[in-house]
């Protein structure tokens, strides 16, 4: 069973709010001020640490194996829109990601970064603090730089398919 835990911070009890149909892998960790929308999934060894600030996950998102989402006390939060795919071993620290975006395996997003709707961050990319990635842009490298623009229909379709696949994978565990 996944570790889902409330915490006490600043005199408040903060309990994860998780939609009833969310898949949580047995060793996923969800702590503190975390909200996860319907149809989403949090996979093996993923950690969502809402202990120091808020993490909001939209609908039909997938947080894949080994990813870590954490924030900065009194400074940065995390918001993922709907149909966001977070690849294996991604680190998101205080960054926001809009609907239909894809964060490739092993990428890192630092505080204050923003990934626009339908954007793609390539595997292994390092998105530096405060970087603003526009809608449907593809970025990659260390540090991440703009590569090209993608068609909105392409990125939306890619992430709908990934979300559908991860919903299917989650159904195998019920």
Question: What are these model-derived regions, one by one?
Answer:
Residues 1-17, 51, 57-59, 65-68, ...:
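Glycine-rich hexapeptide-repeat left-handed beta-helix
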Residues 85:
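Short proline/glycine- and basic residue-enriched helix-capping loop/turn segments at helix->loop/beta transitions
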Residues 2-42:
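N-terminal segments that cap or nucleate solenoid repeat domains
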